[in-house]
């Protein structure tokens, strides 16, 4: 009985595998769809480039556009419908002006007025962006000079303490004023003594003169 039960249970296992395969298949399909997306510039970008590169004054025709795109490696046959839709969209936006024909057929030119406005708008954005950054830098700069103000205030307070030694310099002036008075008196006394000596020296000259006169009188006699 056990063998028969084992044989009956074994065929029930295989049907579970196809369910797992069915779940995995849509994931692969999604991955394949992502890989099929075209890489590179879009049809509208290629059309604008080819029209801007052309030097024809009367505009570029649809046939000339297809030739230029095919020369650049674009598959025109597969993407013919995309090219027509892109041309119509560019005309409605105003990037291209239709010179001749209607719809996708005809000749097309770049709308220079719209290009000039776009260039001016981009230039204005570039000029406005640096102006917004300048006030932020100006606010940060005044914060740094606040610290040196504290240092200068402390330096201004410190020289006030240095004024105290001036009071100590006033005390030695008193003894200097007293000493020169005593010194001036002593030389005055010494100067009076030599006058008496001169008077004494002058007396013997008078005596010598009298003696000379007496000698002359005796000689006359």
UniProtKB/Swiss-Prot annotation:
Sequence ranges of Low complexity compositional bias: 1-11, 27-44
Domain H15 intervals: 39-112
Gene Ontology molecular function terms on file: DNA binding; structural constituent of chromatin
UniProt xrefs under PROSITE patterns: H15
Biased composition (Basic residues): 123-150, 158-221
Keywords: Chromosome, DNA-binding, Nucleus
One BP annotation, GO: nucleosome assembly
Keyword match Nucleus: yes
InterPro entries named among the record's database cross-references: H1/H5, Histone_H1/H5_H15, WH-like_DNA-bd_sf, WH_DNA-bd_sf
Segments of this protein annotated with the region Disordered: 1-44, 123-221
Cellular location(s): Nucleus; Chromosome
Organism domain of life: Eukaryota
One CC-aspect GO term: nucleosome
Pfam family name, one: Linker_histone
CDD domains according to UniProt: H15
Family statement: Belongs to the histone H1/H5 family.
Function summary: Histones H1 are necessary for the condensation of nucleosome chains into higher-order structures.
Protein name (record): Histone H1C
Organism: Xenopus laevis (African clawed frog)
